[in-house]
């Protein structure tokens, strides 16, 4: 059985990042915009995770390692995404939304997708997800916003091997 952590407990140690913080969103690995040197940019809007998988490479929901979670203001994040696209001479055709946690826990995920999809030359938007927060309604909203593909992280179909 999967162990799903209440989002409220995650929000208790939240650090909001917006224009007033002056925190750059290019260059960090856990938040913001990540350029892997191709036509794809990774976008990480928050660090929330609703799971506590023992094998997680980022230990996203471990209080022993991560005392705080981060959530980036949507408009501030979009400014940095557009700047990264500009710095790459508008040669970005794909945005992949992922996280060191669970991207669908970001409260404005559909709006993020819609606005990213409207950036010049961005043809395809994808997202990584553990799938546990997806409902039929949410999937339809993400698709309507312009999401082209959800890459589900399925660790095992057998509870014996899946360590939540």
Annotate the PLM regions.
Residues 57-77, 84-106, 117-134, 145-164:
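Core AdoMet radical
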Residues 134-140:
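Short, acidic/polar
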Residues 78-82, 110-113, 139:
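Generic structural signal for well-ordered alpha-helices
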Residues 49-56:
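Short cysteine clusters
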Residues 1-45, 60-68, 83, 87-91:
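N-terminal [4Fe-4S]-dependent radical SAM core
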